[in-house]
Amino acid sequence: MRINGHTRMAAVVAKPIKHSISPLIHNMAFEKTGVNGVYLAWEVEAKDLQASIENIRRYDMFGVNLSMPYKQEVIPYLDELDVSARLIGAVNTVVNKNGILVGYNTDGKGFFKSLPSFAIRGKKMTILGAGGAATAIIAQAALYNAEEIFVFTRQASYEKIVSKMAAISHQTKSRIQVLTLEDADSLQDKINQSDLLVNGTSLGMDGVSMPLPEQLELPSQILVADVIYQPFETPFLKWARNQNVTAVNGLGMLLYQGAEAFELWTGKPMPSQEIWQCLEELYK
């Protein structure tokens, strides 16, 4: 990587963020595409978020990615929001368009791009959880014209999630049904109807927890996906593979949401396959 007077910056803004592999992904992409850029990790306090966003304009940066806890907090400091960011109510990518700061959410697009030979249009999806990553996937599935989306959430969050999903359903004219994770019979019924089952919760990051009861059975044609990429095989994915269905972890989502951001910044496609091979070696 050559850094000179023409090098432009991009960064990921969050707290904590030192653990992020986004700098590895994007700096590899800059190098392989010949784009004169560098990507850093900015660990920013909440009181400094506005100044950090203003620096995008000040230093003519490509833009930034955002992670927790700033995906919603950043919105008042932006000039425009893309349709996906507006629908989800969260931003993970800011693009500097000649001094106009535009917020996008590439998580949902990245997720669906990571699925092998699968298109959600006209299909049914069951998703566990309705937090940030799950909401991005739900909204993108709605924008991609999924036939029906079944959202399972904890009883304690049910009323809040019903309201949130009603807003997405209204804006996209999609069919979204919210049910409780505690209702195992309904969960089995909706899984049986679905083409895609997604774990959108953090359950499994410890290598032990399951987001659903292990006695549930999967139909043979279903595709199973997890948003978690560490561990590489979560208990949820192992459970699915033991039932002989295709199961995909969250590493591809991480890569492809970054690829969407990279192309928005540079106008060039990220060499995703080359970078994927490096990531697989790191995390397998």
Curated annotation (Swiss-Prot):
Primary role: Involved in the biosynthesis of the chorismate, which leads to the biosynthesis of aromatic amino acids. Catalyzes the reversible NADPH linked reduction of 3-dehydroshikimate (DHSA) to yield shikimate (SA).
GO biological process: amino acid biosynthetic process; aromatic amino acid family biosynthetic process; chorismate biosynthetic process; shikimate metabolic process
Quaternary structure note: Homodimer.
UniProt-annotated binding residues for NADP(+): 129-133, 227, 250
Pathway(s) this gene product operates in, as recorded in its UniProt entry: Metabolic intermediate biosynthesis; chorismate biosynthesis; chorismate from D-erythrose 4-phosphate and phosphoenolpyruvate: step 4/7
Positions of shikimate binding: 20-22, 67, 92, 107, 229
Native species: Streptococcus sanguinis (strain SK36)
Keyword Coiled coil in annotation: no
EC number: 1.1.1.25
NCBIfam families the UniProt entry points to: aroE, PRK00258.2-4
Matching HAMAP family: Shikimate_DH_AroE
PANTHER family in the cross-refs: BIFUNCTIONAL 3-DEHYDROQUINATE DEHYDRATASE_SHIKIMATE DEHYDROGENASE, CHLOROPLASTIC, SHIKIMATE DEHYDROGENASE
Tagged with keyword Oxidoreductase: yes
Name of the molecule in the record: Shikimate dehydrogenase (NADP(+))
GO molecular function: NADP binding; shikimate 3-dehydrogenase (NADP+) activity
Family: Belongs to the shikimate dehydrogenase family.
Stretch forming the signal peptide: none
Keywords recorded for this protein, A-Z: Amino-acid biosynthesis, Aromatic amino acid biosynthesis, NADP, Oxidoreductase
Catalytic activities: shikimate + NADP(+) = 3-dehydroshikimate + NADPH + H(+)
Active site: 71
